[in-house]
Structures are given as structure tokens and as C-alpha cells.
Amino acid sequence: MKVAIAGYGDLTRYICEEFVQAGHELVILTRSFKPQIESPGISQAITDYTISSLKATLADCEVLISTIGDMSNAYTSVHHTLIQACQESPKCKRFIPAEFAVNIETYPDEPGFYYAIHEPVRETLRNQTNLEWTLVCIGWLADYFVPSKNRYIKDIDECHPINWKANKAVIPGTGNEPVDFTWARDVAKGLASLIQAPTGSWEPYTFMSGERSCWNDMAALIKEKYRPDMPIEHVSLHATANMIKAAKDEDTLILADYYLLSISQACAIPQDKAKAHKEKFFPHIHFRTLREGLSQFDEKPNSIM
């Protein structure tokens, strides 16, 4: 199957490896030529993300997946253009926008900094009928638990409760709130399987999960295996509210949004739906637990998880 990928971000690097392995042909939409992309089964198309520049590329693709993670209003405008380009394409009638976050079916406004730019795109998809689409929900990426050299996913430092660089854990809430974790490579494998599902079988939300746990248990595991002296502190809901009240910059507000993301329990993927989607869309995909991924890291400490 020929698949178009909008953007060459962190997740795209896993997609390039796993989609080719699954037998798909990829064309990466990018604003500038990237020599590292060129390999068997993968080509690139230079675009300025206008309808005219997308038309020829999408003409013979069956699916468009976006990994564009822009945090500005450009996210909204580019995704609206991608939707329109698919609608005008004779063949590309399936679209997956760049979500890949938490349980946005139940908590559509989490994290807060996502909502304003993502919701208009979701609404546009809901209000049309000539494209099949789905919003993929994965919880937290498990990759943040390994060093940066072992993942394509970039560091987010203090925005992740386990901060490798600072060698400390700052856990939002009680730390017992449920959180689901999924490895990025397994997400890519899941997407490669999802696009092979029969036409008309997609649902508005697709759920993946490698493991249901909580931040306290994950921090204890990291202390046990790698960082026995790592200090752990907790940030309460009240303290987070005070952070927001006293915030003088955007970075503080974003950090508070990350805290609320865990405290609200939005990071918990509905287990019944994850199980149903595993059977329906991913019957041959093994979603690794955190321990399984860390065991692979221990065995091959120079590999990309």
C-alpha cells in the first residue's frame, strides 16, 4: 500500500522503519530535501503544504498520516489543507491527523495547550463524510524512560515526571492516578496494521496501550533498575493551581498543563476499548510493557527501542 506521511518528525522515523518492514511504500511530505530519508521503499515529495503542491503526490496514495506536531496555529491551518487535499484526491480517502496523545475521547481538552489548535481539526473531520479518519490515542510514550541516545523521541525535560538530565522525579498528584504507556515503535507497528483494516471499519477514536500503570510504580522501577539515589517529589493539584495563578510565562503554563494531564486521569486509556481495538485492528501486534522494553534496552544498550 502506498502511504503519504506529512512531516518528518520523531514518530516518522519509526514509521519509516516499521511500514517498510510491513511491506508498505512511503512518500514523506517535507518542506525541504532530506537526504537521510532516501532508502528502499521510501521517497520524499517537497511541498509548501498548499493544495496545488499536494495534489500530484496524493493522487496515487491510499492513506495520509500526519505527524506534524507544530504547537502554533499553523497546526490547524496545515491540517485543514491536508483534509481538503484528501477530499480532492481521487484515491487518498483515509486520514490520520497528528494526535497520538491521551484519552481525548473522554478528555478532549487535555492537555490544555493541545485543545485550541486541535479541536477545530477534529470538528472539521466530524462534520464531513467523504473521508474516513480516526484519532489515535496512546497515553504516554514509554520511550522517555530510556536515555535519549536510545530513542528518536526528543527530550521534554521537566515536562516528563522522570527527568533523566536532572536525575529527579517530579510526580503530579498522588502518583497513583492510572496512566497507560506505549512504546513509539509499537505505535508505528500499530499504524501499519491499522491502515490495512477494511474500508469503513475505522472508528472516530483508536486506542493503543502497552501497559496500564501509574507514575509511582514507574518511578520505583527506574530507581530499582537505574537510579537508586533519584529523589522523588510530588506536586499536588492545589500546588498546580497556584502555579497557574502565579505564572508569568508560557513555559510555566505548559508545565502546569502537563501536571494536570496526569492528575485528571486523562492519561488512562479505556481498557475495554484498547482490548477491543487490539483484537480488531492489531491482532498480530505485540504492544510491549515498560519492563519488556527496558529488558531489550538492557540487552542491547546501544539500540533504538
UniProtKB/Swiss-Prot annotation:
Broad EC category: oxidoreductase
UniProt keyword RNA-binding present: no
Catalytic activity: L-pipecolate + O2 = L-1-piperideine-6-carboxylate + H2O2 + H(+)
Molecular function as annotated in GO: L-pipecolate oxidase activity
Keyword NADP: yes
EC number: 1.5.3.7
Keywords on record: NADP, Oxidoreductase
Pathway noted in the entry: Mycotoxin biosynthesis
Family that this chain belongs to: Belongs to the NmrA-type oxidoreductase family. Isoflavone reductase subfamily.
Its biological purpose: Oxidoreductase; part of the gene cluster that mediates the biosynthesis of swainsonine (SW), a cytotoxic fungal alkaloid and a potential cancer therapy drug. Swainsonine production occurs via a multibranched pathway and is dispensable for fungal colonization of plants and infection of insect hosts. The first step of swainsonine biosynthesis is the production of the precursor pipecolic acid (PA) via conversion of L-lysine (Lys) to 1-piperideine-6-carboxylate (P6C) by the aminotransferase swnA, the latter being further reduced to PA by the reductase swnR.
PANTHER family for the chain: NMRA-LIKE DOMAIN-CONTAINING PROTEIN, NMRA-LIKE FAMILY PROTEIN
Identification of the protein by name: Oxidoreductase swnR
Organism: Arthroderma benhamiae (strain ATCC MYA-4681 / CBS 112371)
